[in-house]
């Protein structure tokens, strides 16, 4: 009997006097043919298939198809990818644990073994999304924000502690430690994973999926991973492989070096703009070229982090000597570093100078051409040269819907006993935030050095600026202190406010009341400048209409200038003690100064801060939970509720039902994000969710955020399509979650309309433009519509994660025929929709969609089914991926 490829490829290697078994790609190549020029990212996938070959979920034909990708730099085949581990943050992690607990209830009700609902691979949940910038600008800010976080989220944290003891291989990194992606980069990521199997140590690539779209940051360490929805991550941790098509791989060649004064942030904004224009949705991006020789790992991680912003599944940097240097710096053991080097060299995954893999398509960037940039005011891919920011702000200001804003007159206000004028274009938030940049010592040291020069010249921030510093790990505080830069940042208001995502995810906290009142009184267009990765409208703060992504030193600079109308390339940023003008170039640190400061970063800092990473504060340790297999649901809880998704589930799936007489709940434009569909930020008192919380006795000050309430479906379904900036074309000129209920045409909230339709037994549809569901890997952007009764979404195109999430929740994603849009069809939202033949649905094939207009005329469209794989079709036929997993457990 001939050996399988898996068995035939077994080999051993030596590292640090230890023997490791592994599945050798060179041995497999004796059967598969030459794979030396396969992109490194696909070699990781190939090893994954080889190691998991079982003749069922992974066959020799699957392995042959991936190796054969080289022939056309493309392959049309579905494969089953099994990541080594799962990463979560608390906004997505809490609902995931709610789902797991609800699955145990369903398995128990259907007569199965609840012990089967347990992770089969390691799961790390980092609590980083809950801290809010309530206090800022003084030494007490950090302590006060931590205290408030623990008070507000006590119930959620009790639940997560229950999950930690109830589920195996499930670890929680407590609040106040850092941001999940930076903790992953600095500590959790191994580059090469290993485990004891049958008394042998087995080595294989470190791979993962995460419940946050920026999981891709770890690609900078040569670890293949990307963001998925919570439901897909839950299935993965329970042993279900991730179904995917073999991806196209776009090669991005980097050459040269960054010019003096140019930062990694400027580079990533340029890369994002180029790749978004190229079109990389659903594709891998792999970086290569001699520019990598001098590109620090922190810069690579910054670029990899923004893969969701350029639309790619991942932004992969192969492992090389730069990777090993970073692993040593961040405190990984010499045994681990030696294993990574030996393994990747043996497998042909090591990057050598001059490597030119085969790619589907390529781009090239000479890093010497990158210029100082921001991105904004509403999308991360809209890069603006520093010198053009005032023009970009003015252009966006003119587009504001309220014509009464034309005057843009300053508004007088009083703050702390002093009178000021708040001008149009004021920078009211300046935040050094997000792991994208706070994982990068060079840009943080640059911010500190710029602050030092500014303070020494007597410059001060403008009084309306809310400044904050929220690093992604405690190591940042250590090296800023070691470089003696912390006092200067404090002097300019950039005091430590927390170790977490804060402003970048909308946890910017309230502005001082006089400033909020002035913005409302003058209907002013104000700005936020942040070192983050997302600037979608309504995300950072409800009153801030323009949001700009910038490097940390530019964040400090804009706090000093205080206005988006100031041209920092040519105008003074302020005046010194002698009233002489000071320009940005006068306080911008040189690359030599930055390099000297970065030398202060030491391995001891990483080892000290990560020695007790799972321990937490005294408040965390004091949280006590009772051990049990199933959760004790509390009827009066407004944070944690038993989700209803499995209430009516049977052991066998029912046949698919056609959709008849569906009404359109919302008709939306292009680039509708998951933030629009399911916001994470503040809850308005007069919204359906706000009214629900008040009816349950929750005071307005205790609303917390939508993100923190994701364990309660009652809040989340009411918050679906509730973003204050969403524009439903069925109600022109109206912003917010409103729609027309048909046929009576009453204008009411989307939630109230959906409930009326449910009472009438009417299925619902959503119509949209291009890039529907871009942004965060937010499974509530699919769960919420499902609970509202949405059966189908018809769009011009979908972003990858959201399309998958829709299928995972039993919602059908369809694409309009090429060249056909809601506008070319003249849709008003009054149409009714019929979709028949769903029992004969095929991946990627066309589906007839019948439109019946208000006047009775009809039209049939052949829409493309965006269920892309046979496995996804199976999930859809089971009413969702978790229903499928439960039924497998019952077999």
Locate predicted features.
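Long, structured ligand/cofactor-binding scaffold of large enzymes
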Residues: 54-257, 264-269, 372-375, 394-494, ...
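Mobile "lid/hinge" segments at catalytic clefts and subdomain interfaces of large enzymes
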Residues: 199-341, 350, 443-463, 495-609, ...
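Extended C-terminal subregions enriched in glycine
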Residues: 464-486, 490-494, 498-503, 507-509, ...
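Extracellular/luminal Protease-associated
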Residues: 288-295, 533, 754-755, 759-799
């Amino acid at each position: 009997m001939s050996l399988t490829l898996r068995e035939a490829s077994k080999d051993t290697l030596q590292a640090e006097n230890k023997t490791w078994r592994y599945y050798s790609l060179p041995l497999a190549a004796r059967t598969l043919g030459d794979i030396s020029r396969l992109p490194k990212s696909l070699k990781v996938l190939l090893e994954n298939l080889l190691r998991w070959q079982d003749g069922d979920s992974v066959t020799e034909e699957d392995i042959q198809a991936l190796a054969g990708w080289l022939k056309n730099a493309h392959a049309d085949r579905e494969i089953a990818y099994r990541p080594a581990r799962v990463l979560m943050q608390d906004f997505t992690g809490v609902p995931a644990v709610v789902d797991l607990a609800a699955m145990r209830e369903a398995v128990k009700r259907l007569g199965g073994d609840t012990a089967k609902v347990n992770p089969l691979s390691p799961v790390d949940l980092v609590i980083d999304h809950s801290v809010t910038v309530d206090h800022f600008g003084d030494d007490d800010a950090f302590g006060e924000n931590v205290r408030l976080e623990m008070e507000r989220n006590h119930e959620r944290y009790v639940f997560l502690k229950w999950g930690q003891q109830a589920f195996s291989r499930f670890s929680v990194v407590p609040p106040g430690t850092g941001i999940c992606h930076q903790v992953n980069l600095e500590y959790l990521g191994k580059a090469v994973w290993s485990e004891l199997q049958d008394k042998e140590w087995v080595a294989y690539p470190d791979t993962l999926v995460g419940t946050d779209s920026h999981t891709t940051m770890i690609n900078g360490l040569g670890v293949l991973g990307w963001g998925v929805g919570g439901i897909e991550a839950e299935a993965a941790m329970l042993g279900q492989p991730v179904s995917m098509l073999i991806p196209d791989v776009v090669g991005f060649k980097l050459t040269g070096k960054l010019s003096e004064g140019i930062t990694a942030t400027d580079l990533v904004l340029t890369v994002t703009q180029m790749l978004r224009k190229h079109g990389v949705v659903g594709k891998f991006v792999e970086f290569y070229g001699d520019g990598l020789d001098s590109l620090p790992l922190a810069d690579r991680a910054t670029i990899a982090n923004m893969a969701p912003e350029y639309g790619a599944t991942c932004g992969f940097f192969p492992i090389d000597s730069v990777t090993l240097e970073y692993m040593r710096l961040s405190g990984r053991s010499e045994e681990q570093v030696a294993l990574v080097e030996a393994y990747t060299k043996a497998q042909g995954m090591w990057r050598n100078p001059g490597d030119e893999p085969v790619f589907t398509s390529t781009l090239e960037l000479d890093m010497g051409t990158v210029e100082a940039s921001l991105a904004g005011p509403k999308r991360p891919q809209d890069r603006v040269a520093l010198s053009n920011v005032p023009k970009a702000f003015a252009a966006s200001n003119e587009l504001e819907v309220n014509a009464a804003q034309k005057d843009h007159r300053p508004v007088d206000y009083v703050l702390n006993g002093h009178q000021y004028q708040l001008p149009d274009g004021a920078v009211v938030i300046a935040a050094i935030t997000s792991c994208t940049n706070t994982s990068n010592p060079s840009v943080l040291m640059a911010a500190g050095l710029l602050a030092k020069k500014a303070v020494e010249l007597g410059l001060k921030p403008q009084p309306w600026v809310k400044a904050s510093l929220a690093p992604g790990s405690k190591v940042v505080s250590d090296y800023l202190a070691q470089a003696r830069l912390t006092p200067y940042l404090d002097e300019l208001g950039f005091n430590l406010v927390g170790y977490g995502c804060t402003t970048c995810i909308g946890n910017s906290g309230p502005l001082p009341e006089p400033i909020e009142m002035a913005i409302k009184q003058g209907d002013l267009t104000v700005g936020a400048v942040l070192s983050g990765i997302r600037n979608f409208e309504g995300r950072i703060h409800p009153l801030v209409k323009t949001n700009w992504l910038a490097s940390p030193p530019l964040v400090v600079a804009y706090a000093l200038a205080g206005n988006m109308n100031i041209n920092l390339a040519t105008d003074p940023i302020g005046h010194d003690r002698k009233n002489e003008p000071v320009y940005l170039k006068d306080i911008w640190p040189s690359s030599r100064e930055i390099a000297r400061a970065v030398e202060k970063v030491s391995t001891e800092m990483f080892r000290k801060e990560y020695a007790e990473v799972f321990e937490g504060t005294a408040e965390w340790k004091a949280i006590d939970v009772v051990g049990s297999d199933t959760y004790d649901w509390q009827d009066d809880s407004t944070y944690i509720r038993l989700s209803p998704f499995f209430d009516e589930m049977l052991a066998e799936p029912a046949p698919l039902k056609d959709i008849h007489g569906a009404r359109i709940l919302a008709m939306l434009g292009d680039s509708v994000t998951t933030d629009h569909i399911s916001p994470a930020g503040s809850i308005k008192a007069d919204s359906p969710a706000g009214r629900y919380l008040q009816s349950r006795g929750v005071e307005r000050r205790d609303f917390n955020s939508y993100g923190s309430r994701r364990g309660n479906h009652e809040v989340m379904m009411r918050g679906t399509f509730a973003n204050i900036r969403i524009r439903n074309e069925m109600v022109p000129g109206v912003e917010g979650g409103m729609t027309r209920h048909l046929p009576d045409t009453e204008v009411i909230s989307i939630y109230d309309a959906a409930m009326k339709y449910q009472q009438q037994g009417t299925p619902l549809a959503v119509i949209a433009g291009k890039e529907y569901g871009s942004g965060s890997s937010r499974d509530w952007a699919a769960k919420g519509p499902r609970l509202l009764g949405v059966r189908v979404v018809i769009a011009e195109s979908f972003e990858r994660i959201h399309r998958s999430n829709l299928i995972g929740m039993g919602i059908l994603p369809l694409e309009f025929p090429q060249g056909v849009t809601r506008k070319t069809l003249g849709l008003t939202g009054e149409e009714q929709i019929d979709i028949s033949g769903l029992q004969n649905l095929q991946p990627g094939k066309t589906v007839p969609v019948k439109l019946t207009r208000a006047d009775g005329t009809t039209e049939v469209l052949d829409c493309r089914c965006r269920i892309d794989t046979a496995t996804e079709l199976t999930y859809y036929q089971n009413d969702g991926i978790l229903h499928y997993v439960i039924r497998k457990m019952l077999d």
